[in-house]
Amino acid sequence: MYDVIVIGAGPAGLQAALTLGRMHRSALLLDSGEYRNGTVLHMHNVAANDGTPPADFRAIARAQLAEYADVEVRDARVERIDGEQGAFTLELADGGTVAARRIVLATGMADELPAISGLQELWGVGAFSCPFCDGHEHAGKPIAVIGEAARAAHLIGLLGRIVSSITVFPTEGSFAEEDRATLEALGAVVASSSPLSIAREGETVTLTTAEGEASVAGIFVASVVSRQRAPFAEQLGLAMLPSGAIEIDDFGRTSVAGVSAAGDIAHRASLPGAMAAVALAVAAGQLAAVGHIQSLMAEGA
């Protein structure tokens, strides 16, 4: 039986495994091979890794974990978690089972995009959601924002000082006159209708509407809906927040003893939502690991 099993090998899971390994706690890191930033070419706003390809970041982290005898890494998908603190059993997709005293969920969220032809193919390449991660790369260039008015206005406020111009498109239909006036007051050009399709050629992204085409350097989508990528919160009956995230305390502990959650799948109730950022995921992974280490030590394990 492992001290801790970490499910998910993005930044949060990798850091949790590293912290456990450094404290000589037996840990199993299970990597499904699915990552929220799996289509992203370069990650940004991460000290010492600004511009690093996420795949390189993960590869380096896994190579470093190999130096710790107490950490095992497997490419495996978990189907189900049963049990309680001190005796959790995980069923794997290959039919095997593994057991642990504690669990860290670091499975990440999945993005559900507006149903616009071509958008999914451009996600992380020509279409983005995070201005902190990808805004600077569009400095001095024209961009488009897609989304309902309130969220679009927030993005316009963040990106307006960075880019040369912003054209805002409704996700569907058209903006109400009051919303149009608000968006125009922020300096945006307001399109009359939603995009029918999106395509990219070279460095240019073209949005096609019923009225014609608009060409920009990139798109920021304000209407992304995020959901839990894995079913474990429901399986375990974890307390959830209105944002769709798992409720945690300062050390990532959930409502079920022995189960912690780290990364963008969880946040404290005092926050409106989880910020999807590599640096924050790393910090959350370390906190979750430390919480379990302290708990195990208190038990004399």
Language model segments and positions:
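Beta1-alpha1 glycine-rich phosphate/pyrophosphate-binding loop at the start
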Residues: 2-59, 141-142, 150-173
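Short, well-ordered coil/turn residues at beta-beta hairpins
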Residues: 8, 100, 106-108, 113-115, ...
